[in-house]
């Protein structure tokens, strides 16, 4: 970037803000800039070569700066690609682990279902046996009740001949 310069100071014309200075000054016909006659010890050709060398130096610096920026962009691009690759690999590992868990859980679920079916079958058998035992209990209670009634009847001392031992 080159600094902006006032074009009036380059051509010897006073800027508009100096319009209050009379034109009949001792500088009439000369450059009113007090630094115009300042001797630098550098002639015009040296000054121009210095400017052009500064321009080429600034052009080289700008080129170097652009190269550095491009190198950084390339490195960042490569780094981003590598980071994206690592991220994809990490996600793939997570997906693989999740699938492994799914398979393990499915197997576990099947085993639990088999056990549940066995328990349900056992429960049915126990329920059937329980019903059968209740029926037997009811029958036995009825028999006991009948026997007690027979023992309490007034004719309990008379027995059939079949009952005698």
From Swiss-Prot:
Signal peptide: none annotated. Residues 70-133 form the bZIP domain. It is found in: Nucleus. GO terms for molecular function: DNA binding; DNA-binding transcription factor activity. InterPro entries: AtbZIP8/43, bZIP, bZIP_plant_GBF1, bZIP_sf. Residues 98-112 are annotated as: Leucine-zipper. This is Basic leucine zipper 43. The lineage of its organism: Eukaryota, Viridiplantae, Streptophyta, Embryophyta, Tracheophyta.
């Amino acid at each position: 970037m080159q600094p902006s310069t006032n074009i009036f100071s380059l051509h010897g014309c006073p800027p508009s803000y100096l319009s209050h200075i009379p034109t009949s000054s001792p500088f009439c016909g000369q450059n009113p800039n007090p630094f115009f006659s300042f001797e630098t010890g550098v002639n015009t050709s040296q000054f121009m070569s210095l400017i052009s060398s500064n321009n080429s130096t600034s052009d080289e610096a700008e080129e170097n700066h652009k190269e550095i920026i491009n190198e950084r962009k390339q490195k960042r691009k490569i780094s981003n690609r590598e980071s994206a690759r690592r991220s994809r690999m990490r996600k793939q590992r997570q997906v693989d682990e999740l699938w492994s868990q799914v398979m393990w859980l499915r197997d576990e679920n099947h085993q639990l279902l088999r056990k549940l079916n066995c328990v349900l079958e056992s429960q049915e058998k126990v329920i059937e046996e329980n019903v059968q035992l209740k029926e037997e209990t009811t029958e036995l209670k009825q028999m006991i009740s009948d026997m007690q009634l027979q023992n309490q009847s007034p004719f309990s001392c008379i027995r059939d001949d079949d009952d005698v031992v």
